[in-house]
């Protein structure tokens, strides 16, 4: 939308109502562009959220698939904003939907050999990495997010639940005692020459 971007989706909603579409359809036409920027409101209905999610994932997979992923400060297709929107939508829906599965499903809509190999995995990793800035805005340490992502889960709602729980635990005396005990065990193992277990 190059002219009147503030009206994006609004005209479509009016057309949908004029054509006799259900109100839920008209609402989804308007609200699937939400959130439009950081901190913007989310869609008010499951239908609008579903379309918003599908639209963002299609864009991410399509642009990544042709090798136009953001680099450095360049993000001409606003993919960072789109990825954060995907996270916010999935967390808000509080669903068990798996980001990896959703990216794979979006990639399947493209003809064979259209996308670069591992496009879905690249989109998944990129989107999960956007959690970092999202949590920084909430003053949650990046180490908390890394600890959660080290478990291999890719469902944003589950990631958010675990980050919230771990962040709450991290400030307790029990967490401090656990960290101290872990450090002592690591020092003992290092001095004895034994390899540490693969614990992140």
Indicate residue ranges for each PLM-predicted region.
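Amphipathic alpha-helical "coupling" segments that flank catalytic cores
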Residues: 1-200
């Amino acid at each position: 939308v190059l002219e009147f971007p503030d009206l994006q989706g609004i005209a479509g909603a009016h057309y949908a109502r004029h054509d006799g579409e259900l109100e839920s359809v008209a609402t989804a036409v308007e609200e699937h562009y939400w959130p439009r920027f950081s901190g913007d409101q989310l869609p008010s209905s499951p239908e609008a959220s579903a379309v918003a999610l599908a639209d963002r994932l299609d864009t991410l997979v399509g642009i990544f698939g042709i090798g136009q992923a953001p680099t450095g400060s360049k993000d001409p297709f606003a993919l960072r904003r789109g990825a954060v929107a995907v996270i916010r939508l999935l967390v808000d829906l509080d669903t068990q939907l798996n980001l990896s599965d959703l990216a794979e499903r979006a990639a399947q809509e493209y003809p064979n050999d259209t996308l670069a190999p591992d496009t879905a995995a690249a989109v998944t990793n990129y989107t999960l990495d956007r959690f970092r800035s999202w949590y920084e805005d909430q003053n949650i340490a990046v180490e908390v997010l890394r600890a959660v992502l080290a478990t291999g889960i890719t469902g944003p709602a589950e990631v958010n639940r675990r980050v919230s729980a771990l962040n709450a635990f991290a400030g307790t005396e029990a967490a401090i005692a656990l960290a101290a005990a872990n450090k002592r065990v690591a020092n003992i193992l290092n001095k004895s020459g034994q390899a540490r277990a693969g614990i992140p």
